[in-house]
């Protein structure tokens, strides 16, 4: 966590916090909504666009994924950017999120949103690209909110693909 890579990632976060997107109220409003309700975004999309109520399966995938995710987070114990900022003398001003009380690595929002995108996209391939774009947007919101480093997001996506590709997931969810 004191490596040059971490310092580079901190500089990237500070740059993002000074970007024009950070000052765009529409973008930041969307990102703040994702912080609290990203599962609801998938539920609404499924109902309104796909025409299927997938609330129960989305809740179950999120619940099951949280167990896997928590094991990974507490294994790696990576501090959040705001926890390292003072030691790196970085001027980082993260959003105060109730969802940011666990270790940073991997990003839970990345993990769960990509897991949902992969699952729903496997059931409805014509929606796969939109769903993965949505998962990406949810994932990068964590950078703009100052809650994760880029590598947290990358590993969240990687772990989600492994999770959804597992025999246990395929058996339980029929993919």
Describe each region flagged by the PLM.
Residues 1-148, 158:
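Hydrophobic alpha-helical bundle signature of multipass membrane enzymes
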Residues 163-175:
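C-terminal membrane module of polytopic membrane proteins
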Residues 156, 162:
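Post-HExxH zinc-binding segment in Zn-dependent metallohydrolases
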